[in-house]
Amino acid sequence: MAEAIERSLSDIDVVAIRPASQADAKAALSVLKDAAKGSDHIAKLIASDAPLKDFLVAAFALSPFLRDTARSHPAILEALLSETLPAFLKRRIEAARVAWRGDAAGAALPDAEIMTRLRRAKREVAFAVALADLSRLFGGRETTGWLSDFAEAAVSAAIDHLLLGAHESGKFVLKDSSAPSTASGVVVLGMGKLGAGELNYSSDIDLVVFYDPQSSIITNRDDAPETFARLLRRLIRILQERTGDGYVFRTDLRLRPDPGSTPLAIPVEAAMLYYESRGQNWERAAFIKARPIAGDLEAGERFLKELTPFVFRKYLDYAAIADIHSIKRQIHAHKGHGEIAVKGHNIKLGRGGIREIEFFVQTQQLIAGGRTPALRLRQTETMLRMLAESGWIDGATAEELIEAYWFLRDVEHRIQMVHDEQTHLLPETEPELRRIAYMLGFEDTASFSNALSRVLRTVERRYAQLFEQEAKLSTETGNLVFTGQQDDPDTLETLKKLGFQRPSDIANIIRTWHYGRYRATQSVEARERLTELTPELLRVFGESRRADEAFLRFDHFLSGLPAGIQLFSLLGNNPGLLSLIVNIMSSAPRLADIIAAKPHVFDGMLEPGLLAELPTRDYLAPRIATFVGGGRHYEEVLDRLRIIAAEQRFLIGIRLLTGAITGLQAGRALTDLADLIIAAALDAVLEEVRSAHGRFPGGRVAIVGMGKLGSHELTAGSDIDLILLYDYDDEVLESDGAKPLDPVRYFTRVTQRLIAALSAPTAEGILYDVDMRLRPSGNKGPVATRITAFAKYQRTEAWTWEHLALTRARCICGDESLVGEAEAIFAEILTEKRDIAKIRKDVEEMRGLIDKEKPPKDIWDFKLIPGGLVDIEFIAQYLALVAPARGVTSPPAGTHTLEALKALGAGMMNANDLDTAAEALVLFTELSQLVRLCIDGDFDPKEAPAGLVDLVCRAGDYPDLTHLEADIRRLSKAVRRIFQGVVAAA
C-alpha cells in the first residue's frame, strides 16, 4: 500500500451509522461494558461522551461478527484504542508474515501453531479494518489494500512454512533456510482481486502455483509432483480449515490450467505450453490481474513476463474479439430484463454489478493491451483512468464507473461484515436491508435503494454501450430488423409468433452474427449469405420444441466454425440438411457440442447417401484405410485415427438420431468402428516398437475385446475393455533390435503404447478410454498376458464372474494363429460342465452386491434398475455357463446379448419369458443408445432437451413419457421376475 495516513479511532468526530434497533444497541453497549472491566482505555471511553463510544455501539449493534469478536477478544479493542490504525495493522501484518518462524533457529513449526498464529492475526486485522471502514477513516481503496496486504503476508508465511518443513524432511534443499522462498523456483500467483490488491472483506483467495522441476532445491525430481501436491493440500488446510480460532482465507486453486485433470501445482514449462497451445480467452482475462505474492517472487515475475504475449496479443485477434464479445453477451443475457430489484440483488454478478465494471475494463485491456503497455495495469480504478487517458473511453464514463465501483464495493463489504460471510446478495427482508442501509450511513432503506438503483443503472448503461455497433438484417418480410442496441418491438413480436420464448436474446444473437464477431461471419459474403438464410433459420428453429435452447446451441456451433460461406450456402439450398441441424440442436446437446468443438465432423453430413447406407464394417474399413494411409509418421497416423473415429462416431450418431438405424444397429456399427480403429492403432504401435526394439522372433499379439466391445454393444462414449494376449518362441531371450528387450518387457511396452495411443488426450481428443481390469488377476496382474498363462488362469484360477465375462470375449484383431488359439480357449472354458448350484449362488450374490453398492438413480437408469440391462445380461451369461451341464449348446463367446439370449433361451426358458426379456433388451438398448448419444450424464425428463424427450418416446412408439414410463416399469418388473425364476430354476 501507499504510505498510510496516521489515523486513530479516536479521530472519529461524526458518527454516520446508527443501530438498527434498541435491542441491538443495548447488546452492543453491554459488550463494551464487559470489555471495560479489564481495560482502562475502554472504561475511560464508556465514561466519556466521545463520538467513538456512539460509533462502537452502532458498529457492534449492526455487525454480530464484530460484537462477538469484541466480546471474545476485548484485548483487540484495547490495543486499537492505544495506537494508530496503520501502526496496528502493520504490526499484525508483519506478525503474519513471520508466523512461519519457530523459536529455534531453522526449526519448522507444527502446522497447528502457524494456523493459530495466522488466525489470530486475521481476526485482529479483520476487526480493525471493519471499524476503520465503517467509520470512514478508511475509504474503499485503503480497506481493500490492507486486506490484500494481509492475505499476501499470510500466504507467504504459509509457503515459507511448508518449504522449510520439506527442507527438514529431506524433500528439498533450500538455498537459505532463513528465507525459504528465495530462489526456490516456486511461483505463487495471486489472481483476481488479490492480485490487483482489491480483496473484499470476507473474500476467498484465488491462487495459482507453479514450480520449476529443474530447481536445485528439489532432491528427487520424480517425486516433485506428489511432493508439491501434498504441500498444497496442507496449504489449503492451513489457510481455510475452521478451528476454534476461525479461518484465514477460503482458498481456490481452480484457475490453474485444466483443473479437472491436473495436480494442484504443475511445472512452469507445462503451464507455459498449456497457455501457448490451449489457453482460453477467459484465462487471458484472468491473468491480467495476476501478481506474484509469495514463493520465489523473481521467478513469478519472470513467468508473467514470459506469459505477456499470451495475455496481451500484439495484433487484434478477431476470433478472440468474437469470443470476448460472446462472453459479454452471455453475461448480459444472464441478467434478464425489467426493473432492477434491490432486495436479493447480487452486487457482484447482478445487472449493473461489480463484475460488469471489471469486465468493461478487462475486455478493452485484452483487445488493446498488446499494443499499449500502459493498459496492462491490474487495479480497476487505475485502469479506468488509463482507458480515458488513452482515448478508449471518455472522462465522464471513467469517473461514473469509478464512483460506482467504490460505492458497490462499500455495499459488498457491509453485506459481508454482518456475519463475516462470503456473500454478495443483498438481504431479502426489510429489517436486514435496513441494517445494510444504516451501515452505509443512509437515513432509511428508501434512500439507500434509490442511490443503489441509480448506480446499478449507470453501470448497466455504460456496460451496454461497450462496442456498440449497428447492423441491419434486411429481409423481404420487413419485420425482422436488428439495429444497434435496442430491440425492435415488431421484431420481438415476430420472433414470439415464430415460437421463441426469449425473443430479445435471439435478436441479440443475430446482431452478433451480423457484427462479424465470429470467424464464420467475418467476411462480407458470409454475412450476406447468412442474412438471406436467417428468416428460414428462424422459421425452422421456431418449429422445434424449446426453440430458444436449440437456437443457442446453433449459435455456439457457429461460433466455432473456421469459415461460414460453404455452410450458409448449403443450408440455403438444402432444406433437409437444415432440418437435420435443427434436430441435432434441439435433441442432442452432446452432438451439438461435438460439432461446435470439431466442425470438421460436419463435413461427413454432406455425403448424399449418408442416411441411406448402413455403417457396416465393409462401409467403414475402406474409408478408414484411405484416410489413415496418408499418415507419414506414427503421431500423424494416430491423429488421423482420432479424426476419422470422431467423424464416423458422429455420423453413426446422426443415423441413430434420425431413425435411419436402430439402437442395436448403432451398437454394432460403433463396435465395428472400434474394431477397425484398434486394429489400425495396433499396427502402428507394433511398427513403432519394432523400430526402437526390433522384432521378437516368433512373437504374436492378439487383442481381445471384452464387455460391450466384445458383444457388439458399444454406445456413444463407451469405454472399451481389452486384454492383450501374446506368445513367442521359448528359446528366444530378447528382441533383435538396437535396444533389445526381454519378452515380458517387450510385450508390456506394446501394451502400454497401445493404451497410450487409444486413450492419451491430444488436440484431436482421445480415441477411447481403455479399461484392462478384466485381464487375469485384474490390476494386480501384468498388463500383457501370455496365451499359456491366460489358459492356465482361466482353467484353474478364474472366478465365476470372470467366466461370466468370458462369454462376451471376442478377438478383434491380431495374429490369426494366436486368435485361433484364444478362441479355442474360450470355447474350452465355456463348454465345461459346471456345478449349477455354485453358479446360481455366485450370480445371485453378484446381482445382490450390485443392487447394494450401485442402486439405480431412478426408473430411467436402464442399466441398473431391477429388471434392467444388467439383469438381462446376467440371464444370458448365466445360461451360457450352465448350458453344457444341461445339454444345451452355448453360442460362441462374443455373441451379441440378444442373439445369445434367443439361442440359449430357446432351450432353457419359458417362451413368453424369452419374448419379454428380448422385448425389454431391445427397448432398453434403444433408449440407452439415444440417451448416451444425446447428452452427457443421466436422463432427467424434467431437465432433458424437449427434442430428446420426443425421441425416447418415439423409440418405442409411445405417445408420451407417462406411457413410456409405465411400460418400462412393466417390463423391468417382469424381467426381474424372469431373472429370479431362471436362476432359481436352473
From Swiss-Prot:
GO terms for MF: [glutamate-ammonia-ligase] adenylyltransferase activity; [glutamine synthetase]-adenylyl-L-tyrosine phosphorylase activity; ATP binding; magnesium ion binding
CDD domains, sorted: NT_GlnE_GlnD_like
Necessary cofactors: Mg(2+)
Residue segments, region Adenylyl removase: 1-471
EC number: 2.7.7.89, 2.7.7.42
GO cellular component: cytosol
Catalytic activity reported: [glutamine synthetase]-O(4)-(5'-adenylyl)-L-tyrosine + phosphate = [glutamine synthetase]-L-tyrosine + ADP; [glutamine synthetase]-L-tyrosine + ATP = [glutamine synthetase]-O(4)-(5'-adenylyl)-L-tyrosine + diphosphate
Region described as Adenylyl transferase: 475-986
Keywords noted in UniProt: ATP-binding, Magnesium, Multifunctional enzyme, Nucleotide-binding, Nucleotidyltransferase, Transferase
GO biological process: regulation of glutamine family amino acid metabolic process
Pfam families: GlnD_UR_UTase (PF08335), GlnE (PF03710)
InterPro entries, alphabetized: GlnE, GlnE_rpt_dom, NT_sf, PII_UdlTrfase/GS_AdlTrfase
NCBIfam families recorded: PRK11072.1, PRK14108.1
Family: Belongs to the GlnE family.
Job description of the protein: Involved in the regulation of glutamine synthetase GlnA, a key enzyme in the process to assimilate ammonia. When cellular nitrogen levels are high, the C-terminal adenylyl transferase (AT) inactivates GlnA by covalent transfer of an adenylyl group from ATP to specific tyrosine residue of GlnA, thus reducing its activity. Conversely, when nitrogen levels are low, the N-terminal adenylyl removase (AR) activates GlnA by removing the adenylyl group by phosphorolysis, increasing its activity.
Protein name: Bifunctional glutamine synthetase adenylyltransferase/adenylyl-removing enzyme
